[in-house]
From Swiss-Prot:
One of its GO terms (cellular component) is cytosol. The gene is grpE. Residues 29-52 have a biased composition (Low complexity). This is Protein GrpE. Homodimer. Participates actively in the response to hyperosmotic and heat shock by preventing the aggregation of stress-denatured proteins, in association with DnaK and GrpE. It is the nucleotide exchange factor for DnaK and may function as a thermosensor. Unfolded proteins bind initially to DnaJ; upon interaction with the DnaJ-bound protein, DnaK hydrolyzes its bound ATP, resulting in the formation of a stable complex. GrpE releases ADP from DnaK; ATP binding to DnaK triggers the release of the substrate protein, thus completing the reaction cycle. Residues 1-28 have a biased composition (Polar residues).
Length: 215
């Protein structure tokens, strides 16, 4: 009986060159990958170096002295603007305070001018009271003179008398206390019981009147 050996023959075993071929292929691929990474890293390094060079060139082109001059000019402008604002604010406050003072003085002394116009009237009245002569004619003349002085004071103070006899009734300037039969047209002022007065077109006191009744 012929026996066959389980040991492979030399012809069945791979040669040394065949065994090393897969290892050589893997090594080549790894080397190629490393080379590609190295190339990319080198390109990135060159790009970064280029950017740094551009930045350095831009910084070198900046005139530091000019920038400092511009900064100082801007600071000076800001200081001037602040001073102008502070000055304007102070002036506005002074104007407001002066305005308040003027209004307060106007309220306090509004009657001062008119009071001065009335002083001659007071003098005449006091002189009339001091007269003990008992002369009625002289007393009347004194009263008439005093009345003229009072009218003059009213005129200076822009006070106007309302004596609307024969005028149409005006509810803004007249106060009717009754309606009476009369020959005048209806709503015509027939009589003035108490004269009214205005101050610069503002009614101080309406005239008390009677008015013609409708026929």
């Amino acid at each position: 009986m012929k026996h066959t050996s389980d040991t492979p023959s030399n012809s069945d075993m791979p040669s040394d060159s065949q065994a090393t071929q897969p290892n050589a292929s893997a090594t080549g691929q790894a080397a190629h990958a490393y080379s590609s990474q190295a190339q990319r890293a080198s390109a990135d390094a060159q790009a970064v170096a280029g950017d740094e060079a551009a930045v350095a060139e831009a910084v070198a082109d900046v005139d530091v002295a000019e920038l400092r001059r511009q900064l100082e000019a801007a600071e000076e402008k800001a200081r001037q603007n602040y001073e102008n604002w502070a000055r304007a604010t102070a002036e506005g406050e002074n104007i407001r305070r002066r305005g308040q003072d003027d209004v307060a003085k106007a309220h306090k002394f509004a009657i001062e001018g008119f009071a001065e116009y009335l002083l001659p009237v007071m003098d005449s009245l006091q002189a009339a009271l001091a007269d003990t002569s008992g002369d009625a004619t002289k007393l009347r003349e004194g009263v008439e003179l005093t009345l003229k002085q009072l009218y003059a004071a009213f005129e200076k103070g822009r006070v106007t008398e309302l004596n609307p006899v024969g005028e149409k009734f005006d509810p803004h300037r007249h106060q009717a206390i009754s309606m009476v039969p009369a020959d005048q047209e209806a709503n015509t002022v027939v009589a003035v019981l108490q004269r009214g007065y205005t101050l610069a077109d503002r009614v101080l006191r309406p005239a008390l009147v009677t008015v013609a009744a409708p026929k």
